[in-house]
Amino acid sequence: MGQIEWAMWANEQALASGLILVAGGIVATAGRFTQWYFGTYAIAAGVLVCLLEYPRGSRAKGSTLERCGQRYLTAVLKLLGPLSRNYYFRAALHLALSVPAGFLLATILGTVCLVIASIIYLLAAVRGEQWTPIEPRPKERPQVGGTIKQPPSNPPPRPPVEARKKPGEEDATPAGGPPGGPRVNPIPVTDEVV
């Protein structure tokens, strides 16, 4: 049985919590809640979390599906160096970003989700995981001569000679009448109206 890669789960949880923070911040700011400035903070924090978490890290074993447009943000995260690779840093950052958003009811759900993502990142860091970017692999082109080992030795199955139609037989009319022509109705039709 394989080992669970916790960073993958933390990444999905943090990305979802960033989106939830943005949505709650929009509700709080547009609704002019009494502490609406926490809503604007939640929007900024949610956008930051989404930008940080959008690029997926590559898995230790197997292949990883890259998100659409991820390579551009991956280049930015590579520039941050060890700050973007270290999951201890991400856990602390997410925990610190979640505290001010917890003072407003509209953003409390995003706060709880971000705290859960922080805990999962801490678990991933304790287990020794770190973020590694998905590197594009060069596509291997199959060589035409290399894919075919031997041509087939048996011909494909064909119907018996008697069952095969010859080109001239299609024009000839069989005894029962042409297949595409008019047909004779076996039931007599009368045109009497009562």
From Swiss-Prot:
There is a cross-link at K149 (Glycyl lysine isopeptide (Lys-Gly) (interchain with G-Cter in ubiquitin)). GO terms for molecular function: heme binding; metal ion binding; oxidoreductase activity. The chain crosses the membrane at residues 8-30, 36-53, 87-104, 106-126. It comes from the Eukaryota. Its main location: membrane. The modification Phosphothreonine is found at T147. This is Cytochrome b-245 light chain. The keyword Membrane applies. One of its GO terms (biological process) is innate immune response. Keywords: Cell membrane, Electron transport, Heme, Iron, Isopeptide bond, Membrane, Metal-binding, NADP, Oxidoreductase, Phosphoprotein, Transmembrane, Transmembrane helix, Transport, Ubl conjugation. It is found in: Cell membrane. It comes from Oryctolagus cuniculus.
